Amino acid sequence: IIRNDIVNDIAILKSSKIGNEYIKIADDGAMKGEDIFVLGYPHGKHLSSESKVTKGVVSALQGLGNNYSQMQIDAAIQPGNSGGPVINDKGELIGVTVATADYEVMFDMFKSLPQNMNFAIKSQMLTNILDGSKISYETSKPSWFSFGSNDVKETVAEVDKATVYLECWSTEIAMKEAKESAAKLVDTVNSE
């Protein structure tokens, strides 16, 4: 871990496996109503080892409680999407997925379940962290006009090459899971 920003829930990691793939960061950030795509590994690799993509829009330029470091998106995200890229239709990074609305809390407060209420850290927060860590990155210049020349499928395929699966382990959790698995195995053997 090179840098950990607990407030924004972002960590900068260094890998011994360096690839040539990267995602340019949008210099002009996100715009409300902008089409977006989210890539990630919802529920880890339990569904499949292939990354998944969902589509949506930027719903608001602030997160919960007017949090200016976040934006609200309506693209579907699940556990396992956290840390994944949020890109615009040009393949530029405009955010990093971070959270979804807590159904139980929202139901207790409003007596209704939230739909498509998800959040991402804005790319500006990421560039602040990268700058503070003296890590170089590439931005794209603001583009005021989009002529639709980009093929979205090709754009997503390029970003997919730079999206990696990351599995985090806690020795305490791993030991607990190992004990539970062993207990299930003993129960199975004893019942036969």
Predicted regions and their residues:
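Extracytoplasmic
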Residues: 6-10, 18-20, 31, 53-58, ...
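C-terminal cap/linker of serine protease catalytic domains
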Residues: 20, 42-46, 93-191
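Catalytic nucleophile loop of clan PA
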Residues: 76-97
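A structural connector/turn signal
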Residues: 24-25, 72, 151-154
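Conserved active-site neighborhood of the chymotrypsin/trypsin-like protease fold
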Residues: 1-48, 66-70, 132, 136-146, ...
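Short amphipathic beta-strand and strand-loop transition segments with alternating hydrophobic
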Residues: 1-2, 62, 154
